[in-house]
Amino acid sequence: PSPRLLVLDEATAGLDPIVRDEVLEIFNEFTREEDHSILISSHILSDLEKLCDYIAFLHQGRLLFCDEKDRLLEEYGIFVGTADQVNSLQDGAVVARENSSFGGVRCLVKRALVPAGWALERPTVEDIVLFLVKGAKEQ
Protein backbone atom coordinates (compact mmCIF):
# COMPACT_ATOMS: atom_id res chain seq x y z
CA PRO A 1 0.00 0.00 0.00
CA SER A 2 1.22 3.50 -0.80
CA PRO A 3 0.99 6.40 1.67
CA ARG A 4 -1.94 8.79 1.43
CA LEU A 5 -0.35 11.54 3.51
CA LEU A 6 3.17 12.93 3.24
CA VAL A 7 4.45 15.12 6.08
CA LEU A 8 7.39 17.17 4.81
CA ASP A 9 9.62 19.72 6.53
CA GLU A 10 11.60 22.01 4.23
CA ALA A 11 11.47 19.33 1.53
CA THR A 12 12.97 21.57 -1.18
CA ALA A 13 15.43 23.57 0.91
CA GLY A 14 18.92 23.58 -0.54
CA LEU A 15 17.88 22.23 -3.93
CA ASP A 16 18.81 24.05 -7.10
CA PRO A 17 15.82 25.56 -8.96
CA ILE A 18 15.64 22.86 -11.65
CA VAL A 19 15.67 19.95 -9.21
CA ARG A 20 13.29 21.83 -6.91
CA ASP A 21 10.83 22.21 -9.79
CA GLU A 22 11.10 18.49 -10.57
CA VAL A 23 10.43 17.60 -6.92
CA LEU A 24 7.40 19.89 -6.87
CA GLU A 25 6.07 18.14 -9.98
CA ILE A 26 6.43 14.78 -8.20
CA PHE A 27 4.47 16.21 -5.26
CA ASN A 28 1.80 17.56 -7.62
CA GLU A 29 1.46 14.15 -9.24
CA PHE A 30 1.05 12.57 -5.78
CA THR A 31 -1.77 14.96 -4.83
CA ARG A 32 -3.68 14.49 -8.09
CA GLU A 33 -5.19 11.40 -6.52
CA GLU A 34 -8.20 12.54 -4.50
CA ASP A 35 -7.25 10.66 -1.33
CA HIS A 36 -3.62 11.88 -1.26
CA SER A 37 -2.47 14.93 0.69
CA ILE A 38 0.75 16.66 1.68
CA LEU A 39 1.36 18.64 4.85
CA ILE A 40 4.47 20.70 4.16
CA SER A 41 6.39 23.36 6.04
CA SER A 42 8.62 25.63 4.01
CA HIS A 43 10.28 29.02 3.95
CA ILE A 44 10.15 28.95 0.14
CA LEU A 45 6.79 30.61 -0.36
CA SER A 46 6.80 30.24 -4.14
CA ASP A 47 6.89 26.46 -3.63
CA LEU A 48 3.82 26.66 -1.41
CA GLU A 49 2.05 28.81 -3.98
CA LYS A 50 2.71 26.19 -6.68
CA LEU A 51 1.79 23.20 -4.53
CA CYS A 52 -0.75 24.05 -1.86
CA ASP A 53 -4.51 24.50 -1.83
CA TYR A 54 -4.49 25.78 1.78
CA ILE A 55 -1.80 27.84 3.49
CA ALA A 56 -1.29 28.56 7.18
CA PHE A 57 1.33 31.11 8.17
CA LEU A 58 2.90 31.26 11.61
CA HIS A 59 5.02 34.23 12.66
CA GLN A 60 6.64 34.46 16.09
CA GLY A 61 4.27 31.84 17.44
CA ARG A 62 1.17 33.60 16.12
CA LEU A 63 -1.09 32.32 13.36
CA LEU A 64 -1.35 35.23 10.91
CA PHE A 65 -3.64 33.39 8.52
CA CYS A 66 -4.96 29.98 7.58
CA ASP A 67 -7.05 29.92 4.43
CA GLU A 68 -7.45 28.63 0.92
CA LYS A 69 -4.62 29.96 -1.23
CA ASP A 70 -7.00 31.17 -3.95
CA ARG A 71 -9.17 33.00 -1.41
CA LEU A 72 -6.09 34.77 0.00
CA LEU A 73 -4.99 35.83 -3.46
CA GLU A 74 -8.50 37.12 -4.22
CA GLU A 75 -8.93 38.91 -0.89
CA TYR A 76 -5.85 41.09 -1.22
CA GLY A 77 -4.39 43.35 -3.88
CA ILE A 78 -1.29 45.48 -4.24
CA PHE A 79 -1.88 49.18 -4.86
CA VAL A 80 0.90 51.48 -6.02
CA GLY A 81 0.14 55.18 -5.97
CA THR A 82 0.49 58.39 -4.03
CA ALA A 83 0.21 58.81 -0.28
CA ASP A 84 -2.88 61.00 -0.85
CA GLN A 85 -4.59 58.20 -2.78
CA VAL A 86 -3.80 55.67 -0.07
CA ASN A 87 -4.91 58.05 2.68
CA SER A 88 -8.26 58.52 0.91
CA LEU A 89 -9.15 54.84 1.30
CA GLN A 90 -11.68 53.86 3.94
CA ASP A 91 -10.53 52.57 7.32
CA GLY A 92 -9.39 48.96 7.20
CA ALA A 93 -8.65 48.95 3.46
CA VAL A 94 -4.88 49.24 3.88
CA VAL A 95 -3.34 46.22 5.58
CA ALA A 96 0.28 47.41 5.39
CA ARG A 97 2.23 49.95 3.38
CA GLU A 98 5.76 50.80 2.34
CA ASN A 99 7.31 53.74 0.56
CA SER A 100 8.26 52.85 -2.99
CA SER A 101 11.47 53.83 -4.72
CA PHE A 102 9.76 56.42 -6.94
CA GLY A 103 8.42 58.41 -3.99
CA GLY A 104 4.97 56.90 -3.91
CA VAL A 105 3.45 54.23 -1.73
CA ARG A 106 3.05 50.50 -2.31
CA CYS A 107 0.53 48.78 -0.08
CA LEU A 108 -1.39 45.60 0.53
CA VAL A 109 -5.10 46.34 0.48
CA LYS A 110 -8.32 44.42 0.98
CA ARG A 111 -9.89 44.35 -2.48
CA ALA A 112 -13.46 44.56 -1.15
CA LEU A 113 -12.69 47.90 0.53
CA VAL A 114 -11.07 49.60 -2.49
CA PRO A 115 -13.25 51.62 -4.89
CA ALA A 116 -14.08 49.98 -8.21
CA GLY A 117 -11.79 51.13 -10.97
CA TRP A 118 -8.64 51.35 -8.90
CA ALA A 119 -5.85 49.37 -10.56
CA LEU A 120 -4.65 46.62 -8.25
CA GLU A 121 -1.86 44.15 -8.90
CA ARG A 122 -2.45 40.50 -8.03
CA PRO A 123 -0.22 39.68 -5.04
CA THR A 124 1.82 36.54 -4.58
CA VAL A 125 1.67 34.59 -1.33
CA GLU A 126 5.12 36.02 -0.61
CA ASP A 127 3.79 39.59 -1.07
CA ILE A 128 0.98 38.90 1.39
CA VAL A 129 3.31 37.35 3.96
CA LEU A 130 5.90 40.13 3.72
CA PHE A 131 3.29 42.86 4.08
CA LEU A 132 1.56 41.10 7.00
CA VAL A 133 4.86 40.64 8.83
CA LYS A 134 5.83 44.28 8.21
CA GLY A 135 2.38 45.38 9.36
CA ALA A 136 2.70 43.28 12.52
CA LYS A 137 6.05 44.93 13.29
CA GLU A 138 4.55 48.41 12.96
CA GLN A 139 1.72 47.69 15.41
Residues covered by each model-derived region:
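ABC ATPase "signature
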Residues: 66-67
